[in-house]
């Protein structure tokens, strides 16, 4: 009985953690979903962004006390502007999706929303982590050995 309980708890913890991509697995997935070169943003920039925003974790969330918004998913897309979580005041929901869609292991909707973000005038600069960790850096290591 104890063993069954332990197995159940382990399965629950895996379900809560979501999918944590490996670097090359993410690079291949993003390429397949059309992010390589989208709006002039290289695949290496997208992988770098995901590394520093979520550590490649689809279930990452971060609450922002200042404006009471939350960042969701592998790209940490914000509920103030891009998705609806039902609790962020004055949310815009420009991607027209529930924020929960950004937490799925299948990142198709997260990629579609990220494409929407970079179509705005700020482009990829909308992400602070990209500006701080990826901008003007040699990013080849993010796709090196990935055969993409």
Curated annotation (Swiss-Prot):
Protein name: Lysozyme C, milk isozyme
Signal peptide region: 1-18
Example GO biological process: defense response to Gram-positive bacterium
Listed EC numbers: 3.2.1.17
InterPro entries (UniProt xref): Glyco_hydro_22, Glyco_hydro_22_CS, Glyco_hydro_22_lys, Lysozyme-like_dom_sf
Chemical reaction(s) catalysed: Hydrolysis of (1->4)-beta-linkages between N-acetylmuramic acid and N-acetyl-D-glucosamine residues in a peptidoglycan and between N-acetyl-D-glucosamine residues in chitodextrins
Domain C-type lysozyme per the UniProt entry, residue ranges: 19-148
Family statement: Belongs to the glycosyl hydrolase 22 family.
Highest taxon of source: Eukaryota
PANTHER family: LYSOZYME C
Molecular functions (GO terms): lysozyme activity
The entry's keywords: Antimicrobial, Bacteriolytic enzyme, Disulfide bond, Glycosidase, Hydrolase, Signal
SUPFAM superfamilies: Lysozyme-like
Organism: Bos taurus (Bovine)
CDD domains the record matches: LYZ_C (cd16897)
């Amino acid at each position: 009985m104890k063993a069954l309980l332990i197995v159940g708890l382990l399965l629950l913890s895996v379900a809560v953690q979501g999918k944590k991509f490996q670097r090359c697995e993410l690079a291949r997935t993003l390429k397949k979903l059309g992010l390589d070169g989208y709006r002039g943003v290289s695949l290496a920039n997208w992988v770098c962004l995901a590394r520093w925003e979520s550590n490649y974790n689809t279930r990452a969330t971060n609450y922002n006390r200042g404006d009471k918004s939350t960042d969701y998913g592998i790209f940490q897309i914000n509920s103030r502007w891009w998705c609806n979580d039902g609790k962020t005041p004055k949310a815009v929901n420009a991607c027209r999706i529930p924020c929960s869609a950004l937490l799925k292991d299948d990142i198709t909707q997260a990629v579609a929303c990220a494409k929407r973000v970079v179509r705005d005038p700020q482009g990829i600069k909308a992400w602070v982590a990209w500006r701080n960790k990826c901008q003007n850096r040699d990013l080849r290591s993010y796709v090196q050995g990935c055969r993409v």
